[in-house]
């Protein structure tokens, strides 16, 4: 197909949707035909940066600027909507979930002092570090093990916890517009409250006032349970069978550099199992690291669930259906994985250092216990017991 160059005048057709560590996501609000690949001018990107600045979280602006030297932009489907917009006038509600790691690590490479990792989820421990860094105002009660459990009751509890404290793990859209959750940062505040969704959901869920939120969670629970999509995600996450504490040695072995982890421990304290990893052929070391990075992507990706009411008697829809018993409604739904960028090899050291910080913060919070003069520590201790 022909490439289209976007100029400064075209920037007004693009609106801020969110961002991650490496990419900013914009929604196209213009009327041009379907676009797949576009060239962009420096002036277009400069104008985009000005247009979206007021919508970006402050900490994102400080962390990264738009690269105005890029010559092209990646266009992807907006999975918060069904294709061709709103079908037959029905409202579309979408839910983005970042489920995080759904299992407890079982690797024999986990150090004795970090054994807490085998009994406490990474998400729960990371909450403590984020709280200490003042990136979140309170600790989430969400447990990824509940969401991945295969139990409808536990899935419901997990989704309720996410809805009550979305952070950057839960977002709700109505017709493509964000109505619950932040714009993509751990410090974001929700744009609304769960209670305020009651009024919004009247366009989608035929329940009495005060019951729409309950019905919404029932719909989402049924869909997560029925789709089985988390089982597939968990299989990929479990490609990490060495944990970062093992994979880091394979990484240094592959790049043929002295291992900083072993150097910090001292030669007399390096375990035989770590020595074994440093003796592997490069291709085997690379395989360990590749699987770790693929699993890391699966642990950090998001799922987008999109719903619209199916018309009475409608049977020609190409989408799967889910029945909401409490309102006797049938919904079309579709599920997509998003944020599947493969993690770069160069981030291995960062992953190891972050892992150690997370475990250290959680262990210290447990050890300090109640009675300390630090109010934050007291609050942490009470929350994690």
Residue ranges and their predicted role:
Residues 2-385:
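Polybasic, positively charged surfaces/segments
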């Amino acid at each position: 197909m022909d490439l289209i160059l976007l100029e400064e005048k075209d920037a007004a057709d693009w609106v801020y949707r969110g961002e991650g560590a490496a990419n900013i996501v914009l929604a196209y609000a213009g009327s041009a035909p379907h676009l797949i690949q576009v060239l962009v001018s420096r002036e277009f990107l400069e104008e985009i940066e000005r247009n979206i600045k007021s919508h970006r979280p402050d900490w994102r602006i400080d962390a990264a600027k738009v690269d105005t030297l890029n010559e092209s932009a990646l266009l992807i489907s907006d999975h918060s909507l069904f294709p061709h917009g709103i079908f037959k006038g029905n409202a579309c509600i979408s839910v983005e979930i970042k489920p995080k790691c759904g299992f407890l690590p079982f690797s024999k490479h986990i150090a004795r002092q970090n054994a807490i990792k085998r009994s406490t989820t990474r998400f729960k421990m990371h909450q403590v570090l984020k709280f200490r860094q003042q990136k979140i105002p309170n600790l989430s009660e969400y447990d990824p093990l509940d969401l991945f459990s295969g139990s409808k009751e536990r899935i419901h509890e997990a989704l309720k916890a996410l809805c009550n404290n979305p952070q950057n793990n839960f977002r709700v859209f109505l017709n493509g517009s964000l109505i619950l959750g932040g714009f993509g940062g751990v410090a974001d505040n929700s744009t609304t409250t769960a209670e305020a969704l009651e009024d919004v959901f009247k366009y989608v869920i035929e329940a009495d006032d005060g019951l729409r939120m309950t019905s919404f969670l029932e719909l989402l629970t049924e869909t997560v349970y029925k789709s089985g999509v988390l089982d597939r995600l968990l299989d990929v996450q479990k490609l990490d069978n060495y944990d970062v504490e093992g994979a880091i040695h394979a990484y240094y072995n592959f790049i043929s550099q002295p291992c900083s982890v072993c150097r910090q421990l001292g030669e007399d304290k390096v375990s035989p199992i770590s020595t074994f990893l440093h003796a592997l052929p490069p291709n085997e070391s690379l395989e360990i690291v590749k699987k770790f990075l693929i699993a890391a992507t699966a642990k950090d990706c998001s799922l987008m669930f999109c719903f619209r009411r199916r018309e009475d008697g409608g049977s020609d829809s190409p989408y799967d259906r889910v029945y909401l018993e409490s309102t006797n409604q049938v919904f079309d739904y579709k599920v997509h994985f998003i944020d599947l960028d493969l993690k770069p090899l160069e981030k291995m050291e960062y992953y190891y250092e972050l892992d150690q910080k997370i475990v250290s913060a959680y262990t210290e919070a447990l050890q300090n216990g109640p009675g300390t003069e630090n109010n934050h520590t007291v609050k942490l201790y009470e929350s994690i017991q």
